[in-house]
């Protein structure tokens, strides 16, 4: 059945070339909405801890199913939010833009359902090409070329050690199937080979998350990318690193309880704290949201390295919740940029008086971003905090201060953008469009559904 989703994306790309120009945007949204519905139907019964083999190389389980659904769910939302870019593009440019989003969605479906390490690596690298095109072609400023260079350098060259590790695994185990490799190396792998695999592979995953210290490409890419690129990058592409760590963590189990693992947990939690402090100092709205993603993903990486059931469940919950919240924040920031022409918080103040209904969406998303009850972010952060304290109680001050600063910059986003007197240059802005309320509502709807029944996936995992 996973082949159905992949073939559907191929059909979407083909149909995009044939749709009349006056129906291109609506047709693309309709097709991507059908893909979202199809993913919910196909993956409805896959919330169990075991693999659901759909072919010899594709499968889904508790880890991959929510991320696949999230990828399909955000595709139509990204197109809805990209109406401004499509209006300013030619007919050919609009078709290429839509096809790039479809290609990224299809590649993500294969990535999250891949059973082969080499297929996983190839498809992850494939997602870089359309993302680079979105950044360099539809970026807002001339710095987009430099942002694309940073993006390719960090993600492409950072993942080359993973290819070396995959070759070493194949030589050692004669198999690249993820379940087989987990069994073979977890039982028969030497400490030296496992340590080498650890050192080589986490560099790739740290770049993709990214954690603090490997993050220099992310703010540049987010600031220069179009709204669809920022939404997909923050919501899905950053989760590939966390997914890879969660999927292959069994390879690390024999050396997990040592100083290296604890050092990485301390490194990730300390990075989350430093990033939260950096967020408080930001004046650019998109850069602030981008740095907040680095902080959240650093906490996710620390939880995965704890290798506890609570840590894994909290990491998965926070990845899904952060994907929805960060995507919504970037789309709302784009609505401000389209009206004011700037992302500086000092200029975009007083929006509550100009766009009163949008203030509600800003309030809900900022509250979810800081982990206000009963948001899924809070549930994930509680599980992660519990797992980290079980490793060392001395991690509590670091994570605690990171959460405090996270609350500060989340409230700062809302206060600086919505409160105060509007700047004179943005007083005569046009009112909100219905499509803007639509994509904001489509972001908050899954969060509400997770709030209603947050533990269904976690109970299935524990079983």
UniProtKB/Swiss-Prot annotation:
What EC numbers are recorded for this enzyme? 7.1.1.2
Looking up Pfam families in the UniProt record yields:
Oxidored_q5_N (PF01059), Proton_antipo_M (PF00361)
| Signal sequence bounds | none
Q: What class of enzyme is it?
A: translocase
Reaction catalysed by this enzyme: a ubiquinone + NADH + 5 H(+)(in) = a ubiquinol + NAD(+) + 4 H(+)(out)
Q: Which GO terms describe its biological process?
A: aerobic respiration; ATP synthesis coupled electron transport; electron transport coupled proton transport
For this protein, what is any one GO molecular function term? NADH dehydrogenase (ubiquinone) activity
Question: What InterPro entries is this protein classified in?
Answer: NADH4_N (IPR000260), NADH_Q_OxRdtase_chainM/4 (IPR010227), NADH_UbQ_OxRdtase (IPR003918), ND/Mrp_TM (IPR001750)
Q: Which residues cross the membrane?
A: 24-44, 62-82, 98-118, 119-139, 151-171, 198-218, 232-252, 260-280, 285-305, 310-330, 353-373, 404-424, 442-462
Might you report a single GO cellular component term? respiratory chain complex I
Q: Any idea which UniProt keywords this protein has? A: Electron transport, Membrane, Mitochondrion, NAD, Respiratory chain, Translocase, Transmembrane, Transmembrane helix, Transport, Ubiquinone
Q: How does the record say this protein sits in the membrane?
A: Multi-pass membrane protein
The reply on keyword Translocase is yes
Q: What broad class describes the main subcellular location of this protein? A: mitochondrion
Kindly list the places in or outside the cell where this protein is found, as annotated in its UniProt entry.
Mitochondrion membrane
Family that this chain belongs to:
Belongs to the complex I subunit 4 family.
| Cited NCBIfam families | NDH_I_M (TIGR01972)
Q: Say what the protein does.
A: Core subunit of the mitochondrial membrane respiratory chain NADH dehydrogenase (Complex I) that is believed to belong to the minimal assembly required for catalysis. Complex I functions in the transfer of electrons from NADH to the respiratory chain. The immediate electron acceptor for the enzyme is believed to be ubiquinone.
User: What is the designated name of this protein?
Assistant: NADH-ubiquinone oxidoreductase chain 4
What organism does the record attribute this protein to?
Answer: Strongylocentrotus purpuratus
């Amino acid at each position: 059945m996973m082949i159905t989703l992949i073939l559907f994306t191929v059909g979407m790309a083909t149909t995009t070339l044939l749709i009349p120009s006056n129906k291109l945007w609506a047709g693309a949204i309709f097709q991507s909405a059908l893909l979202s519905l199809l993913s919910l139907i196909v993956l409805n019964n896959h919330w169990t801890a075991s693999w659901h083999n759909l072919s010899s190389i594709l499968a889904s389980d508790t880890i991959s199913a929510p991320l696949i659904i999230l990828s399909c769910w955000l595709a139509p939302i990204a197109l809805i939010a990209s109406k401004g870019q499509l209006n300013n593009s030619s007919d050919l440019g609009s078709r290429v833009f839509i096809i790039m989003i479809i290609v990224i969605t299809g590649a993500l479906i294969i990535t999250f359902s891949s059973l082969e390490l080499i297929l996983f690596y190839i498809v992850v690298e494939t997602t870089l090409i359309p993302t680079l095109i979105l950044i360099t072609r539809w970026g807002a400023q001339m710095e987009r070329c430099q942002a694309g260079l940073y993006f390719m350098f960090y993600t492409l060259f950072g993942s080359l050690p993973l290819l070396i590790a995959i070759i070493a695994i194949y030589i050692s185990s004669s198999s690249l199937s993820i379940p087989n490799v987990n069994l073979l190396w977890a039982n028969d792998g030497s400490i030296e080979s496992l340590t080498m695999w650890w050192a080589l592979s986490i560099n790739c995953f740290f770049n993709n998350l990214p954690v603090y210290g490997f993050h220099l490409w992310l703010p540049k890419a987010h600031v220069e990318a179009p709204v669809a690129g920022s939404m997909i990058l923050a919501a899905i592409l950053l989760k590939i690193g966390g997914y890879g760590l969660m999927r292959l963590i069994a390879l690390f189990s024999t050396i997990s309880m040592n100083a290296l693992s604890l050092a990485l947990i301390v490194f990730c939690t300390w990075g989350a704290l430093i990033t939260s402090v950096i967020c408080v100092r930001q004046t650019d709205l998109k850069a602030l949201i981008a740095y907040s993603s680095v902080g959240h993903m650093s906490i996710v990486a620390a939880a995965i390295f704890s290798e506890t059931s609570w840590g894994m469940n909290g990491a998965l919950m926070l990845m899904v919740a952060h994907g929805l919240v960060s995507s919504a924040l970037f789309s709302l920031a784009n609505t401000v940029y389209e009206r004011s022409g700037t992302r500086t918080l000092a200029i975009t103040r007083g929006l509550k008086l100009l766009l009163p209904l949008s203030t509600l969406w800003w309030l809900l998303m900022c509250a979810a971003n800081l982990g206000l009850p009963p948001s899924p972010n809070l549930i994930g952060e509680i599980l992660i905090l519990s797992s980290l304290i079980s490793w060392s109680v001395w991690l509590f001050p670091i994570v605690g201060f990171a959460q405090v600063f996270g609350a500060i910059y989340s409230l700062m986003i809302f206060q600086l953008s919505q409160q105060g007197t509007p700047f004179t240059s943005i007083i005569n802005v046009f009112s909100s469009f219905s499509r803007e309320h639509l994509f904001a509502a489509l972001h908050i709807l899954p969060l509400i559904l997770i709030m209603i029944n947050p533990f269904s996936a976690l109970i299935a995992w524990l079983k």
